Regions:
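Short, surface-exposed amphipathic charged segments that create phosphate/polyanion-binding patches used
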Residues: 31-35, 87-90, 187
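Short, high-confidence coil segments that cap the C-terminus of an alpha-helix
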Residues: 39, 67-69, 166
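Structural signal for conserved beta-strand scaffold positions within catalytic alpha/beta enzyme cores
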Residues: 18-19, 44, 73-74, 102, ...
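Conserved core of the sugar-phosphate nucleotidyltransferase
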Residues: 52-145
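Conserved beta-strand segments of alpha/beta enzyme cores
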Residues: 15, 99, 167-169
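Short phosphate-binding loop-to-helix
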Residues: 3-62
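Conserved alpha/beta core of the MobA/IspD/sugar-nucleotide pyrophosphorylase nucleotidyltransferase superfamily
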Residues: 119-193
Length: 193
């Protein structure tokens, strides 16, 4: 929905599909243009995650093929309390089979009676990596599902799928997101390139 981004992308040869600025999320944008694209599976790399490695995208495609789960996403281990407590880092609670149970900006699960500074030493916590894979039918259903209270409360688009009974399979990656969510993140990213 940004002409500035579209101009830069066209400048390096990317094919650009503009979306309605009223689209509330990347998933809504993907759903709005999917009819112009061929394919059974769609990858959505969030705009604030510019350093996603191609092998992670390959791993998501493989997980989709292996499991048949219509939704896949990636997670990485959170190693420190600072990231765990940051609301800009989306946390993922995973089931034993790798399915995502919940996404939250809060540190979940809560370890009762343990100081939060010790939580990452006591159990694994997972950060969401801003990339999704959807099969065609599931992505097409997204706008019809309607927004949910959970999605609005956390401001996380993926909660719409969970609230409607759909599941995400997760891929664990050693990639640690370099998301650009704050001015400080942008400054750090500029130093990387």
């Amino acid at each position: 929905d940004s002409e500035e981004v579209a101009t830069v992308a066209r400048g390096f040869g990317a094919e650009v599909m503009m979306t309605d600025p009223a689209c509330p999320s990347g998933t809504a944008r993907m759903a709005s243009v999917m009819d112009r694209l061929d394919g059974d599976f769609f990858l959505n790399v969030q705009g604030d995650e510019p350093f996603i490695a191609p092998d992670l995208l390959d791993a998501l495609i493989s997980r989709w093929k292996e499991t048949g789960c219509p939704l896949v996403t990636a997670v990485s281990r959170i190693g420190d309390a600072g990231r765990l407590l940051a609301t800009s880092v989306v946390k993922v609670v995973r089931a034993e089979n790798g399915e995502a149970i919940y996404f939250s900006r809060s540190p979940v699960p809560h370890l009762r009676g343990v100081d939060p500074s010790e939580w990452t030493a006591r159990r694994d916590y997972w950060a969401h990596v801003g990339v999704y894979g959807y099969d065609r039918a599931t992505l097409a259903a997204y706008p019809r599902l309607g927004a949910t209270e959970l999605e609005a409360a956390e401001s996380l688009e993926q909660l719409r799928f969970l609230a409607h009974g759909m599941t995400f399979q997760t891929v664990v990656t050693g990639y640690h997101p370099v998301a650009i969510d704050t001015p400080e993140d942008l400054e750090a990213a500029r130093k990387m390139v």
